Structures are given as C-alpha cells and as structure tokens.
C-alpha cells in the first residue's frame, strides 16, 4: 500500500509548495522509491482551461488531454513521471460530479453534504490508482484557513485515520519573515499557522520554513518547541539561484530524511545526487550566453509561459550556455514604433508562443517578418506557427488578405476552426458554438515528419508524439500556395489532413509547430527542438 505525504501551506501563498513537492519526490526517487504527485485546487472552476493567464498562469496539458495547474509541470520536470488527468482535481470538478450524481438519484434520497459526500470524493481521488506506488505526494492549493480549502483539510485529516497513522505524513510550508528594521527573523507567523492547522485536527510532522536569511539554530529550536515537532523536522528553505538547485538544498537541510523518519523509515544510505549537481554546475558555469526574445501576449506575468521558460533553460543546459530571455509585448510591434526594430535587432533568436484572440496578432506577424527577412532564428509555437503561416501567405505567397477565422470573417482564412479530428482511431467532433471549456484538441497526438526535413533531422525520427491545446489550425486548402511561397509542411497528422509543422529551407532556422513541445522538456532530457533552437541562437550570436 502506498504511503501518503500531504503538503499544506501557511501564512501567505506562493511560497513554493509545488517546487517543494517536486523536489521531495525527486529525492525519494533517487532513493529508489516509486512516487506520484497530485494537486488539490480549491477553486470552483472545473479546470483552469478557461481562466485568464494573468490570474492563473500557464495551463499545463497532460498526455491524456487534461488542462491542469502549472505545478504539474514542475512535478513532471523534476520526477520524470508523466502527469495524468487523475493527478489534478478542483472543487469545481468535485461539485460537478456530486451534483450530477444527485440529479441521477445515485444518493437514493440522502441529503447531500460537504461531510461526508465532498470529503469522500476528495479521499477517493487521493487514493485512486496508487497500488503500484511507494509514496503519493498531495499538494493542497491555497493557504490554511482559506474557506475554499476547508473540505480538503478535513478530508486529509480523515485519511490519516482511514489509512493508519504510520501511512500518512503532513508537511507544512510556512514563511519566516525578516524584519529589516529590527534585523530579526520572526517565527510568530509560523507558530500561528501551525496553531490554525492543529485547530482543524492536523498536527504537522515536518515544518518547512521559507526565509530570505539563514535560520539560526536557536530559532529552529524555538519553532520546534512551540509547534510540537522535532528540531530535525524544522527544515530551512532559503531562496535558490535556480529552481534546479532546490532539491540539493532540501537534501542538505534533511527534508527527505525528516519525512522518511516521520514514517519510521530510518534510511542512512548516502544519496547520489550527481545528476542534479551536474545540472546545477552547468547553470552556474555557462560557457557562453544567448539572448532570445519571446514576443507574446501575456508577458506581464511570466508564469503564463512557465514551461516555455523552463524549456529554454533546458536548451541552455544542453548547449552549456546561459539563455537570457527578453519578454516583449507583441503590441509594441504594431504600427510604426521606432523602438520595435531596435528591440528585435539585439536578439539572437525570436520565439512567438501560443495564445488566444486577435490582440497582439499583427505585432506577432511583424516579428515573424523581421525574423524571416533578417535570417534570425525563429520558433513559432501553436499561435506562433499560425502567425508564421499568415505572414508567409501575405508576404511570400501573394495572399494579401490572409488572416485567421479566429479574428473574424476573412476572405483568405489561412487559419480556420477545426471541427473534427482523429484520436486513437476515432473521430472527435466540435461545434463552432459549443462550450469553451475542455473542447479544444487536447493532449498527445502523433505526427509524421517529412523525410529529409530539418525537423526529421532534429528529432532523428519520422514519427513523433506531442501535446496539443488549440481549436484553430492551418487550413489544409492553402497548403499549395503556402508551399509555393517557400514554406514546407514538414509534419502532418497521420491522416494527412492537419498540418503540424512548417519550416523554411531557405532560412538558417525557421520552424513553426502547432503543438506545445515545451510541455515535454525536462532538465535531464531537454526537448530536441529547444536544444537545436538554442544552438541556432548561439550560432547567430557569433555572427553579430
């Protein structure tokens, strides 16, 4: 039977529960344990798919087509275990399922209540499909005391009794703020957070204390005394230069040992973390650097492109270079902005990421044109590929009125709504006036690469599988004029109906992909497209 580690947060949000969970999972894996990480999100949205990127950040898509929290990206990158739909649950989805059961009469006339119906649903989710695991780590979103999270806190309290006290450990992440005026670290917020947690019936076994300054031994003893945990289970968590240093820091402070000890597992075998040390060394001691501009719509919140940022870092790791990312608002390239050309001229490569809606689209097209004309390495992802096709249609294929039907009626809809596609041998269909949530082409789909193409060489394969999240696609009826304009359709769906990759053979590095390769990139296994893109940027840096 799997053991469960429940991770809660206190004092403030955004302390890094997700990174802590991912780091702990990685350390347990290095000890040979089989792990899986799950996320409980207390918000009432069914999933984050329809939420604003500025509110939620990135939507992380799994192989099986789930739109999930960005923390699942950290889980997958650190552990290497592909996330699944069953690894993320929201209050919205729980209530949706419960209400559907009530409408069907499944509760046989019983009064449907938070306890036991909601809490039972949460417990079922936590325990589902865990028989082949050693540890299941469950992160509870939000902060202890939030009204929204109370059913989850109650559910994990019950699980300790259901599963047996030796099979559940509670890890609580808090903030130990530094008051500059007094020159002191303050432990009182942590004490109050633990008091709130214990008032709900949960005594934490391990305390992780985020702090900007080293936590003195006397303060650890004080926290241990007032929070009723062993001193060895008070783990300092200082800021790190890179998120890939975090597992090393946590191991040095004894997090994995404290958690195993709380389970009664006293394992003294030294841990070999050479893989993580190698990554840390490459990041700390690069042999060069490149500057890549990301021309996007949501650059005001970098979490909106979290996996993209990490994939570029992974490309830098593969090439032993530091990647400097310049975030550029696409709208600055619309009209005659004298600063626009200057901003692009200083870049070694240009990337246009995914997005939705018309705002900023002309700026993205202008950035594509600059990259094409000035032979700057260009990478278009999802909407970025579509903008590359519109730019090519207008400026190299003679289709001056080319646009996307996403932006309104068009005389030349080079980009159109896809209403049906094939998945696992079956046709999926969507209506133009259907719901927004969960109706896109989501999850992993195969593609066939053109023999001799640049992407076939990069992948070293003719067949690939990548993750998608889109409802618009390059209109196959414009394939011929676009190819006459210099674009090569080097990747297609197996049925030959959906363009997946375009490239320009007359350009040093110009590739557009309809999928999201950043979702599969990992520090120990950088995605080949990002590795090659950064290599192209490095080559460009030596030319300017």
Swiss-Prot record:
- UniProt-annotated binding residues for CTP: 13, 146-148, 186-191, 222
Lineage runs: Bacteria, Pseudomonadati, Pseudomonadota, Alphaproteobacteria, Sphingomonadales
Native organism is Zymomonas mobilis subsp. mobilis (strain ATCC 31821 / ZM4 / CP4)
Annotated region (Amidoligase domain), positions in chain = 1-265
Q: What quaternary arrangement does the UniProt entry report?
A: Homotetramer.
Q: Which reaction is catalysed here?
A: UTP + L-glutamine + ATP + H2O = CTP + L-glutamate + ADP + phosphate + 2 H(+); L-glutamine + H2O = L-glutamate + NH4(+); UTP + NH4(+) + ATP = CTP + ADP + phosphate + 2 H(+)
Q: Provide the residue positions that the database annotates as binding L-glutamine.
A: 54, 355, 383-386, 406, 471
Descriptive protein name: CTP synthase
Per UniProt, where does Mg(2+) bind?
Answer: 71, 139
Q: Which gene encodes it?
A: pyrG
Query: What is this protein's function?
Result: Catalyzes the ATP-dependent amination of UTP to CTP with either L-glutamine or ammonia as the source of nitrogen. Regulates intracellular CTP levels through interactions with the four ribonucleotide triphosphates.
